Amino acid sequence: RNRKICFEEPRMYDWNFELAEKTTTIEKAKEYTANWNDMKKNHIGFLLWGPIGTGKSYIAGCIANALLNREITVKMTNFNTIIDDMFPLEDKTEYINALARYELLILDDLGTERNSEYALGIVFSVIDRRYRSGRPLIVTTNLPIKQLKEETNIEKKRIYDRILEMCVPLYVGGSSYRSDIAHEKMGKMKTFFATAESSQAENIIEQTGTKTI
């Protein structure tokens, strides 16, 4: 039940450190969960940043599942979902307050939301309310850390300044996680078809009584 509340996609239920490639970033994420009580007490979060497809969301999901296993309340969502959910609501404040009540809030893919004044206002309201709650926040983004630190747009700058105050930047690099998954699937597909063709050929031989030379 907690995972249904936390995640928007069932595939995320199985994201865990045991299945993750052993990297420095993964080790730091594991340390974060192992020291959760201190992280919570000191309001320390993560800013997972880096190129597209390197596994930032997966790492955040691993952290979420590790904490959910300990009955800690976690919500992982993104601003496109938040903005869509809030648009028809008369009481937007209660929605934002509800997000602030989770022991850990994970905001995925910062920077992919709409760039309108309304959307940026919602983003700031959620971040600012979380800031004032004193609870940890994890953010993932494809935006370079340099851009976050040197943003000149006033509305974006106040958002990024809040995040950088709350979250420790952690670079997630290496090869594209999505490309690696696609490559792995392609390899499995080739193996499957090769096995299928071999099996089909053997069946034909058995049925006709012929042999190949």
Which ranges hold each PLM region?
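Residue-level preference for the first positions of well-ordered beta-strands
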Residues: 43-47, 74, 104, 136
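Walker A/P-loop nucleotide-binding motif
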Residues: 41-61
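Pre-Walker A (pre-P-loop) alpha-helix and adjacent loop at the N terminus of AAA/AAA+ ATPase modules
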Residues: 13, 19-46
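Short glycine-rich substrate-engagement loop in P-loop NTPases that contacts/grips substrate
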Residues: 27-30, 64, 68-104, 114-121
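Interdomain "pre-motor" coupling segment immediately N-terminal to P-loop NTPase/helicase cores
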Residues: 1-8
